[in-house]
Amino acid sequence: MEYDNEENTWRRPSAQKVDRSKCNQIPKRSSTVAVVVLGLAVMSCLLGYCVLSETLPYESRTLRLVIIFFRHGARTPNTSYKTDPFKAYQWPEGLGGLTNTGKLQLYELGKKYRSYYANFIDEEYYEKDVQVGSSDKSRCLMSAATFLAGLYPPAERQIWNPELLWQPIPIHSLPRHLDNIVASTKPCKVWKAMYEELLEKSNKDAKYTKLFEYLSNHTGQDMHSVLEVDFLYSTFLSQQEAGLKIPEWTKNYFPNQMRSAFMHSLALLSHNHTLQRFKVGPLLSEMRENLEKSVSYSGEGPAPRSLLVYSGHDVNVVALWRALNYTEALEPEYGASLVFELHEELDQGFFVKVFYRNNTKIEVPMELKLSFCEEPCRYADFLQYIDTLIPEDWDAECQNTPH
């Protein structure tokens, strides 16, 4: 999904500011020469401003907090199938491992956000400013690490090895059976029952009958679920990206017809408001807590964090997307990111902006229009909406049995 710079997109500047003080350094010669030189200097500064004003760093005057949630980088296949010609292929990174391409994707994304928020994010990394959370999957932890390498190259005082321009930055994660914030893999009985009911209903949809039959015949195994198509579609993509030639028979349904089932499978996990409460509620709760700290900060004492970073999966990006009341099908590419910005204006108070990049190649993110509030989205309105998605007691609503 690519976005053009039309009305629904947002341009931001990206180069260094012009030092206009230097434009006044005029040689002391005759008055005529001085006037000419002064005119040329003014023209030079004006032209310089006109050229660079389109590419100056992001205006951070009103920014108070930035929250970035991205999908991990390119990976190897998670699964195989019975007739897979590459079943015995030796993936150096292992199944589901982050590839070198994936590492570079997230490193470049980190550099993009470094440039994008050049006037907001401090040039030096300080732990008090930043919080980084990740899914406990290796590919997500590694993606977070390479993203941070691009976002925070070490300043001179932070260089601890002149041959390695990198600095360690802490990344926090929970075991998958406890994580209901980033990966959202902690078991939830109510969510599971509701999801399985929706999945069963989807699998009976007549529009998938031919697809299921065709894939079953050619994979040598039962393929009667959009979830199974989801896994197979991802396997084909990963094999293609690795330069492997997938079987000819896949051309009848891959990628287009399989993509529809794949995106439907992703959306099912957060299909309705109730499922979204379970899948996204704890994350929104953590975001809300940090937003509140920024809004209530009086200037006294330690300042609240100004940057939150999360490294997760495509299903998490889709769940967050759907929680924002978007029903359009979404296929987040590797490194796709959702960004929440908290702003403060004297005349408007606090308000929230949301942006989306569908991959790491996009230079300018698309600003999303939020259906549940006017533009700009006042903080109080944003809070009122997300509060409907935040459970008071997640485990109790899930009907999880206490240990």
What residues fall within each predicted segment?
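Signature for phosphate-centric chemistry
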Residues: 2-131, 135-403
